[in-house]
């Protein structure tokens, strides 16, 4: 019988989130920073997809189980503001320490990824924990450098010199919330700091294309997951990294 992946919501040692492990031995760990809505069905699917690609995935729940859904952006924004960047980074640090003490995942080969607000948080984590993180993926990371940010988030481009891990940034060309001017500022900061990064802009799609229906979104999602697999394999899997 084919072995199945294991999936469960973890609430232990002040660490909370959705943990999915592929069958077999300890796999490289990817911590997923959720969108502003919480650990919803889409974020759980992301974790399961990563496990299907051979990675252990932990969707970090820094809302302590609270969930929001469109159109309640105000409620979600208020929740995130109450936690803040520091609260999220503290939760991430606890999770890293927790998993490094376990034998069922390979937390010494750690990647991070995030979507929307989570994409910014993945970028931030890579600059706060540069010695722990081996690869970072940010899908349409909003607020990395937006002077008119609706959540009051400050630019994190000043942290770029601390970045050590390879970085993959993915954006939708039709995303009105993250325009080409922001892409350019992010790229310029990374290039000036001599950092290793790849920026990919997907045509014909807007924000949150990895969670939307439509032919263009389907093509972009397929490509996005292929890039995710290749990027994490190249940087986290023994024999490739």
Predicted regions and their residues:
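N-terminal cap/leader regions of alpha/beta-hydrolase-fold enzymes
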Residues: 1-241
